[in-house]
Amino acid sequence: MDETSPLVSPERAQPPEYTFPSVSGAHFPQVPGGAVRVAAAGSGPSPPCSPGHDRERQPLLDRARGAAAQGQTHTVAAQAQALAAQAAVAVHAVQTHRERNDFPEDPEFEVVVRQAEIAIECSIYPERIYQGSSGSYFVKDSQGRIIAVFKPKNEEPYGNLNPKWTKWLQKLCCPCCFGRDCLVLNQGYLSEAGASLVDQKLELNIVPRTKVVYLASETFNYSAIDRVKSRGKRLALEKVPKVGQRFNRIGLPPKVGSFQLFVEGYKDADYWLRRFEAEPLPENTNRQLLLQFERLVVLDYIIRNTDRGNDNWLIKYDYPMDNPNCRDTDWVMVREPVIKVAAIDNGLAFPLKHPDSWRAYPFYWAWLPQAKVPFSQEIKDLILPKISDPNFVKDLEEDLYELFKKDPGFDRGQFHKQIAVMRGQILNLTQALKDNKSPLHLVQMPPVIVETARSHQRSSSESYTQSFQSRKPFFSWW
């Protein structure tokens, strides 16, 4: 964000929901000798420093007391000025976030974002996650508990401020293999939010709620220029408030990125899948896992996730604990285990074409035994009525358009290509569900692209053209 940012300066507006200590509300120490008694007219000598008063006749002790009182008054004024500057910075920071982080359609999510903003103002900063190839952060609340995962746009694997040196080394030493030519670079945060949108529209409920959020924190990876400018502006606001109040932005610039709610009690799917292979699940519990797995398949296939391994989707297995207090009772509550799946790391989805160069980016869940089981009737009843309705698909496209156009580098032509791939995926999925196929058979279907047909005549209904992609990647298994 540049210096011409439309953000409001701290003196123009204040948020109604946050209050900060103001100068008038501060309690300052009483200064001895600070009060001056004004004598009545014509009674007694004039007070010191009044017109007509001879300073040479004033006792030296009174002069010293007056000087000390004046010095203490200046000290209190300086402290008040510093408090005012700090309050202005805090007000401006919250005002900056509030202008962009409003989610009236999801008040619960907005509460979590507010908790993150308050924690940052209390110097409880997000903590960088050292796994992965991008800059991602655990966001905490004022109690220090992890509440979300934030992934800034400019710290993505191909962002200019990615703190991980591996991608920088790959870009420097092997530029021909840098990036994925089937993806729109530096739109991972939109892909994360888009996957959450598709999940909610289809009522899959496996993606933790994710939205586009603006946050600023000392622990984020900023350029040296941004940090120097931030320190200079804060210093100017503290020392010369009249000058500092002219800045459009105080502090570090907010970063735009994906804000995904943190889920507790989950582990990598690879851990539980190995465990279930050694210790087979009961029939009812295994069916729960299969139903959750099918939802993951539907989501990944529609958004064409190019980065789905068994280490970036999660499983939560709540099994009944052996309670020793219940052994001697006549009544024992028998509770079946509960299995849930969470689909995270959706930042490399929504390609503008099917992979056709070096790598195929396959779905690694296709090699699991669950992928060989035909789709259940439950997933058919949940998904088929939606994706078979052209109006539903059109609404989904419009919602994705409203989300993706927020990016400064948004390109309408690229977006139409992304939607064409998604339409083809939906077409294949619809046919697979109707034909009672399995997830393994689904991924073996030829990739399809469904584009909007261009017509010189205006029509109330759109027509589409379907095409198959014949070119295959060099490595079909990688």
UniProtKB/Swiss-Prot annotation:
Predominant location: Golgi
Catalytic activity: a 1,2-diacyl-sn-glycero-3-phospho-(1D-myo-inositol) + ATP = a 1,2-diacyl-sn-glycero-3-phospho-(1D-myo-inositol 4-phosphate) + ADP + H(+)
Region called Activation loop, residue ranges: 343-363
Post-translational modification: Ubiquitinated by ITCH; this does not lead to proteasomal degradation.
Chain positions covered by the region annotation Disordered: 1-57
Lipid-bearing positions (S-palmitoyl cysteine): 173-174, 176-177
Broad class of enzyme this protein falls into: transferase
Residues annotated as domain PI3K/PI4K catalytic: 123-452
Modification N-acetylmethionine occurs at: 1
Region (Important for interaction with membranes): 164-177, 267-275, 358-367
GO cellular component terms given for this protein: BLOC-1 complex; cytoplasmic vesicle; dendrite; early endosome membrane; endosome; endosome membrane; exocytic vesicle; glutamatergic synapse
GO MF entries: 1-phosphatidylinositol 4-kinase activity; AP-3 adaptor complex binding; ATP binding; protein-containing complex binding
Residues binding ATP: 130-136, 151, 260-263, 345
Membrane-crossing segments per the record: none
Region ranges (G-loop): 129-135
Low complexity bias locations: 31-44
Residue numbers spanned by region Important for substrate binding: 156-158
Membrane topology type: Lipid-anchor
Distribution of this protein across tissues and organs: Detected in adult brain, especially in neurons in the cerebellum, brain cortex, dorsal root ganglion and spinal cord (at protein level).
SUPFAM superfamilies found in the cross-reference section: ADP-ribosylation
EC number: 2.7.1.67
Cross-referenced PANTHER family: PHOSPHATIDYLINOSITOL 4-KINASE TYPE 2-ALPHA, PHOSPHATIDYLINOSITOL 4-KINASE TYPE-II
Function: Membrane-bound phosphatidylinositol-4 kinase (PI4-kinase) that catalyzes the phosphorylation of phosphatidylinositol (PI) to phosphatidylinositol 4-phosphate (PI4P), a lipid that plays important roles in endocytosis, Golgi function, protein sorting and membrane trafficking and is required for prolonged survival of neurons. Besides, phosphorylation of phosphatidylinositol (PI) to phosphatidylinositol 4-phosphate (PI4P) is the first committed step in the generation of phosphatidylinositol 4,5-bisphosphate (PIP2), a precursor of the second messenger inositol 1,4,5-trisphosphate (InsP3).
Protein name: Phosphatidylinositol 4-kinase type 2-alpha
Organism name: Rattus norvegicus
Lineage: Eukaryota, Metazoa, Chordata, Craniata, Vertebrata
Gene (name only): Pi4k2a
